[in-house]
Swiss-Prot record:
GO terms for biological process: meiotic attachment of telomeric heterochromatin to spindle pole body; mitotic telomere tethering at nuclear periphery; protection from non-homologous end joining at telomere; telomere capping; telomere maintenance; telomere maintenance via telomere lengthening. The keyword Nucleus applies. GO terms for molecular function: telomeric DNA binding. This is DNA-binding protein rap1. SUPFAM superfamilies: Homeodomain-like (SSF46689). It comes from the Eukaryota. The gene is rap1. The keyword Methyltransferase does not apply. Involved in the regulation of telomere length, clustering and has a specific role in telomere position effect (TPE). Unlike yeast, exhibits no effect in transcription regulation. Belongs to the RAP1 family. Residues 518-529 have a biased composition (Low complexity). It is found in: Nucleus; Chromosome, Telomere.
């Protein structure tokens, strides 16, 4: 045997090993083979006079060892006798005793100071300790984010550690005023509040409120009210600081009740009182919440366009520049209104969006919609009035981006300018900066439906403005030019007259009675969707009746019939609403209506044969999709009302129109809405698909 774990005098080396090695099989036998001795025990059982070394595992932390208090102070040489277990392994592999310097466990100062109870207890900070922080850190205005200043404090004043000094100053900094570089006398005045002491000295030592603008006598704070302000202490600590011109930052602490109070007072007195008067009223009645300057900072932060100049009212109006209330009735009105405001806004959560209403009041007084945008190079904003007005303000929405129209057609209120948002939502709405309109991406299917609706805005406005002239009058003859196979009524030649162009738009609207179209030849081909019924007459002439009634227009696809015949001899189609219907025609209609209970879909044939009328159960999927798209176009106004309107009568009428259109009951519509998660469009499509299936 080449070497042994023995000393120079021949005695065996006694190792003290952590108990973590006790479960390792063969570890004790390996040391015994080389004449060493081993004991498994914790560090607090180590005897420096008896044990030669203490072995620690490679991954074992010194913080897990139970080091007795003051152990290394009494036995400083034992710091070099704590070895890693790799020393035993390397000695056995190399067959000799290796130096221990490279295998010593590194100990920092915290490990040396560690006791079996953990780190030393943190002492409580006294008033003298906080004076030290103010004199050495706060007044000097040095770099307070480093650690050198706190290291110096920990060395001079060892009652607290470096981290304790640093953390306590962070806590104090929230209540300390900023240091004035120009005038040291304007620094701060400390006020010590002694428990169970009289308030006389305390009241005399408080600073007087200084207001930046003059306040009327009715809104001034008296001495008794100032004493009440002092008695309602806002701080629970034993001391706090005041400054003459206290600057409140934007991130001042506030709660939702504070915003409700601001909104309520601004709505009630905004057009009669100035901003300073409002702040004085709030600070007098709710002195335990905020001071005058804090209320003013909250007003300026959440309502940046409020009038803060002089004694003018906070909300200026062009037509309404009423004078201040008389001093005799001012206090009485204020007391009555304050009680109402407290009950409605402060102690009740029934009005969560009160700030939004005040924002609309302030922004409505601004000339936001004036034509002042022509100076810059931004795109001009064109108002869209057709069913796109804000029901809350009765004002049209303005768009500078044409793509935003797709979103506004189905839900006009979805495109919200951040100016109309409440202060609570202004910071988080879509995570976008203030003043930029918000948009939402659409999928391909929804965008296709929106595009179809967007193209029909002109027809919607035409039907609304020319409702008196939309139907054909008795005795009036209409001439329709022949249409080709690939044309429709929306693309009539641009060379037509003004009357023809007006009729071109009217042809897409619904009529109260069917149109009788007389053409040459046997056949007439409908473009996939019009309820076209051919009269089986002679071989020379064929009469085709196009059902333009509101029932047929709502239940079938609106398409424009393509008529073919002898174009050389017949170039015009005559149409007469007054021509009586023969008995044979009525009989044909009755038979056709009995044969088809559901909506009638017309499939055009390839050759010049009769138009095939299929029942709803045999509708191809392509024609079925076109029919649903058309239905979405017709029910566009009802969908918009259900999404945005708050008028119960309008909502009821919209639901009734949808039920009549889809030929369904209220229970079926309710089940469709529940199955689609409240999405109106998908629910209507689901009801229509049941009709054609």
């Amino acid at each position: 045997m080449s070497f042994t774990f023995t000393k120079s005098d021949g005695s065996s080396i006694l190792f003290a090993v952590s108990k973590n090695f006790e479960h390792i099989r063969g570890f004790k036998n390996a040391i015994d083979c080389f004449k060493g001795k081993i004991e498994f025990l914790s560090f607090d059982k180590v005897d420096p006079t008896k044990h030669d070394y203490y072995l620690v595992a490679e991954d074992e932390r010194v913080s897990d060892l139970d080091i007795p208090k003051g152990f290394f102070e009494r036995n400083p040489e034992f710091r070099h006798k704590m070895l890693k277990i790799a020393w035993i392994t390397q000695c056995i592999e190399q067959g000799k005793l290796l130096p221990t310097e490279s295998f010593e466990v590194e100990l920092n100062q915290d490990d040396v100071n560690r006791t079996h109870d953990g780190f030393r207890k943190r002492e409580l900070f006294t008033l003298e300790d906080e004076k030290i922080l103010i004199d050495h850190v706060h007044k000097n205005d040095i770099n307070r984010f480093g650690t050198k200043v706190y290291e110096e404090l920990a060395r001079k004043y060892p009652q607290h550690s470096l981290e304790s000094w640093r953390q306590h100053y962070k806590y104090m900094k929230k209540r300390l005023p900023p240091v004035s570089d120009s005038d040291e006398s304007n620094y701060c005045q400390r006020i010590i509040v002694k428990p169970y002491s009289s308030q006389k000295d305390y009241t005399q030592s408080t600073h007087e409120q200084t207001l930046s603008s003059p306040i009327s006598k009715s809104a001034s704070v008296s001495k008794s009210e100032n004493k009440a302000l002092v008695n309602n202490k806002r701080y629970s600590d034993s001391y706090f600081y005041f400054s003459k011109m206290r600057r409140i930052s934007i991130d001042v602490d506030y709660v939702d009740e504070d915003l409700n109070l601001i909104n309520a007072y601004l709505s009630q007195f905004g057009k009669k009182r100035s901003l300073n008067e409002l702040c004085a009223l709030l600070s007098r009645r709710f002195s335990n919440r905020h001071t005058f300057s804090e209320w003013r900072a909250l007003f300026m932060h959440f309502f940046p366009f409020i009038n803060s100049e002089g004694v003018d009212p906070a909300i200026l109006s062009d037509r309404e520049t009423s004078a201040m209330l008389d001093e005799t009735s001012d206090n009485e009105v204020a007391d009555i209104d304050d009680q109402m405001i407290e009950r409605k806004y402060l102690f009740s959560a029934s009005e969560p969006n009160t700030v939004k209403s005040t924002n609309r009041l302030i922004f409505s007084e601004r000339k936001a919609y004036a034509a002042d945008d022509s100076i810059d190079n931004t795109p001009s904003k064109v108002p869209i009035v057709n069913s796109l007005s804000d029901p809350r303000t009765n004002r049209p929405f303005f768009y500078s981006n044409p793509d935003s129209m797709y979103r506004s057609i189905s839900n006009p209120l979805h495109l919200v300018d951040s100016q109309h948002l409440s202060p609570l939502n202004r910071k988080t709405h879509f995570n976008n900066p203030i003043g930029q309109p918000q948009f939402t991406c659409l999928d391909d299917h929804e965008k296709t439906l929106r595009e179809t609706s967007f193209r029909s805005l002109d027809d919607m406005s035409l039907r609304k403005s020319n409702s008196d002239n939309i139907f054909v009058k008795p005795g009036e003859d209409l001439e329709i030019p022949l249409l080709s196979d690939y044309s429709d009524s929306e693309n009539i030649s641009e060379k037509s007259s003004d009357d023809e162009e007006a009729f071109e738009k009217q042809v897409t609207s619904s009529y109260s009675s069917p149109i009788k179209v007389k053409s040459q030849g046997k056949s007439s081909k409908g473009s996939s969707g019009l309820d076209v019924r051919e009269h089986e007459g002679s071989d020379d002439d064929a009469e085709v009746f196009v059902d333009r009634s509101p029932e047929s227009f709502g239940a079938t696809k609106v398409a424009h019939t393509s008529l073919e015949g002898n174009a050389a001899s017949h170039k015009k189609v005559e149409e007469n609403m007054q021509q009586p219907v023969t008995k044979k025609q009525k009989k044909y209609r009755m038979v056709n209506e009995e044969a088809h209970t559901g909506p009638t879909i017309i499939i055009p044939s390839d050759n010049n044969e009769k138009v095939t009328t299929l029942p709803a159960g045999h509708v191809p999927s392509e024609e079925k999709g076109k029919f649903i798209n058309l239905a979405m176009h017709e029910l566009q106004n009802e969908v918009s009302i259900l999404r945005s309107s708050v008028n119960h009568r309008e909502v009821d009428e919209a639901i009734d129109n949808i039920l009549r259109y889809t030929n369904s009951t209220e229970q079926q519509f309710l089940e469709a809405m529940e199955s689609t998660g409240g999405r109106v469009r998908i629910a209507i499509a689901k009801l229509l698909s049941k009709q054609t299936s």
